[in-house]
Every structure is written in structure tokens, then in C-alpha cells.
């Protein structure tokens, strides 16, 4: 085989290997047995980070964002692209279906 043939085959193989693949988001289905602890409900949560004592809702209620989760209620059968947390039902509702939950009241 000639050098150009080997080079061409390698170039085509490397191009095919470098082609981007379809990105599929990781999602968890929330089921009826997601939370096996009584009085705990499933929430789809993303952790929030920030300095302790950061201003909270409307800058009136101080919220420690380092110990809070931003969550939405997990509806059975829905998909959660973040992480599903089982939390006690004492949450702060921001009025737009986004909830602030104390992370100490949640289990993984």
C-alpha cells in the first residue's frame, strides 16, 4: 500500500471518530415509590450555591443558600433532568412553582 492510501484511510477513520454524537440528557422518572419514607415527597432539585445569609425572597426573608435547594414538585410519571430528592413538606413557595427547600429536610 502506498503512503497516501494509508494516510487517507487514517484521516477518514479519525474524522468519523471525532464526529459529535447526539447528546441525550440524563433524566429520572419519578414513580409512586420514589420516596419510601412517610411524610416525604419527591422534588426535582438543583442545588443552589451562595454565601450564607444571602438575601432571600424579595430581600425580606434571609435564606441561607448554601443549605437550600431550588426545586419543583415532582409529579408522578414526570421526568426530572436534575436530581430527585425526597424532602419533608416544609417548603417556601416563591409563587411561581419554584420552591426553596431546606436541604437538611431532604434525603437523597
Curated annotation (Swiss-Prot):
Substitution effect: residue 101 to G: Impairs self-assembly and rodlet formation
UniProt key word Signal: yes
Keywords: Cell wall biogenesis/degradation, Conidiation, Disulfide bond, Secreted, Signal, Sporulation
Main location: secreted
Any GO BP annotation: cell wall organization
GO molecular-function terms, A-Z: structural constituent of cell wall
Signal peptide extent: 1-26
Pfam families: Eas (PF22354)
GO cellular component, one term: extracellular region
Outcome of substituting residue 96 to G: Does not significantly affect self-assembly and rodlet formation
Description of how the protein assembles with itself and partners: Self-assembles to form functional amyloid fibrils called rodlets. Self-assembly into fibrillar rodlets occurs spontaneously at hydrophobic:hydrophilic interfaces and the rodlets further associate laterally to form amphipathic monolayers.
Annotated family: Belongs to the fungal hydrophobin family.
Free-text note regarding domains: the Cys3-Cys4 loop (residies Cys-45 to Cys-71) does not have an integral role in the formation or structure of the rodlets and that the major determinant of the unique properties of these proteins is the amphipathic core structure.
Official protein name in the record: Class I hydrophobin eas
Origin species: Neurospora crassa (strain ATCC 24698 / 74-OR23-1A / CBS 708.71 / DSM 1257 / FGSC 987)
Amino acid at each position: 500500500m502506498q503512503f497516501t492510501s494509508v494516510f487517507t484511510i487514517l484521516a477518514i477513520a479519525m474524522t468519523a471518530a471525532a464526529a459529535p454524537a447526539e447528546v441525550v440528557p440524563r433524566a429520572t422518572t419519578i414513580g409512586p415509590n420514589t420516596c419510601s419514607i412517610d411524610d416525604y415527597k419527591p422534588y426535582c432539585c438543583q442545588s443552589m450555591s451562595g454565601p450564607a445569609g444571602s438575601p432571600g425572597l424579595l430581600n425580606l426573608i434571609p435564606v441561607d443558600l448554601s443549605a437550600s435547594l431550588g426545586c419543583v414538585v415532582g409529579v408522578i410519571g414526570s421526568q426530572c433532568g436534575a436530581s430527585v430528592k425526597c424532602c419533608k413538606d416544609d417548603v417556601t413557595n416563591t409563587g411561581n412553582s419554584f420552591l426553596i427547600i431546606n436541604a437538611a429536610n431532604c434525603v437523597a
